[in-house]
Amino acid sequence: PDKLNFVLYARGQVLALDPGITRYGVPLHSGWYKTTLAHNTLVVDEANQKPAEGKCLAFGDEGGVEFVVAEAGDIYDGVRFVRSIALLDENVVVVIDQVRCGGERLLDVALHLRGQWVNLPDGSRWTPPNKDGYRYLREATVRRLEREAVIQVRPKEGWQIATALLTDAPADLITALGIGNHAEDLVPMLMVRRRASALTLVWGIGLDGQPIALSWRPVRAEPPDAMVAAVEVRLPNGKVCTFVANPDRAMAQVTLPDGTVWQTKAIFGVRR
């Protein structure tokens, strides 16, 4: 139940991890390791994904940016989930998640990052539901994510990573400690939660600890109901890159920072 889960490896260490498995018969086997929440992906209505056949929509290299776009398939009834991942350089990874539902659903997108929290923003205590995956979360807190935030984790002494988040509408940002290789191997988890029929979420992971500035760019699409998102990524060195995630291959018109209009039908477009 882990369609579109991803693993991030850098500097000799797994950062965004896959939980793996434990011994059969141990409650953690089905209660945590085999749950969707234990992976870096989408959970709907606090239930595990159904078995499904996902597919790769596109991959390649454009403007020096390596990217891949994949669709999860029929993981939940009436839900479409597309994830685009772009590698800008050895220190910057951008993930764009696009979710569409036939009606209002409870949407959770989780990211598990090894390390320790650094200056975690204040939040209120959050009591996880007594359901597989969720019941094993510890020290859970919640705060409102109006549009954007930056969360930092220290994988080891002398190394921090910064994760910037950008949502298309307010959501809850839940932080907690999940499980790694065993019950006492605690791993920080970020989870963006919204009850809605749609969600577009961007993760910008700075492996050198420098926050990445994320913002939306105005975009028009034909047809108007196509799944399209345009995001501006501003790197710590001042360089700017604009991405379009366009899995429907709609005619997308993006207004760039200089006022010019960029037209593209690419599944994933890049402007630097």
Describe the residue ranges of each PLM region.
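CBM-like, beta-strand-rich accessory domains located in the C-terminal region of large
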Residues: 22-272
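Internal mixed beta-strand/loop scaffold within catalytic domains of large alpha/beta enzymes
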Residues: 1-33
